Amino acid sequence: MAVFEKVQEIIVEELGKDAEEVKVETTFDELDADSLDVFQVISEIEDEFDIQIETEEGLNTVGDLVAYVEEKTK
């Protein structure tokens, strides 16, 4: 499964959104995600990909998060 699809699946599960709402360019604000929601998503992603996400700075969109995960899992 590609990184985007897995990240999308986690966001859908954690935030209760439809997959159609979670696109690369979608911001977490557009998903009505507060800081706790983002923390939960990041925690799940860290577990799934066995990485440590150092900061949420610059992770404003789903695409930003996907790019970060892809870089960390190279």
From Swiss-Prot:
Stretches assigned to the Carrier domain: 1-73
Claim: Glycoprotein is one of the keywords in the record: no
Posttranslational modification: 4'-phosphopantetheine is transferred from CoA to a specific serine of apo-ACP by AcpS. This modification is essential for activity because fatty acids are bound in thioester linkage to the sulfhydryl of the prosthetic group.
Gene Ontology biological-process annotations: lipid A biosynthetic process
Gene3D superfamilies: ACP-like
PROSITE patterns reported for this sequence: CARRIER (PS50075)
Top-level division of the source organism's lineage: Bacteria
Location, primary (coarse class): cytoplasm
Keywords per UniProt: Cytoplasm, Fatty acid biosynthesis, Fatty acid metabolism, Lipid biosynthesis, Lipid metabolism, Phosphopantetheine, Phosphoprotein
Signal peptide: none
Compartment list: Cytoplasm
Cross-referenced PANTHER family: ACYL CARRIER PROTEIN (PTHR20863:SF62)
NCBIfam families for the chain: PRK00982.1-4
Functional note: Carrier of the growing fatty acid chain in fatty acid biosynthesis.
Family affiliation: Belongs to the acyl carrier protein (ACP) family.
Name listed for the protein in its UniProt record: Acyl carrier protein
Gene behind this protein: acpP
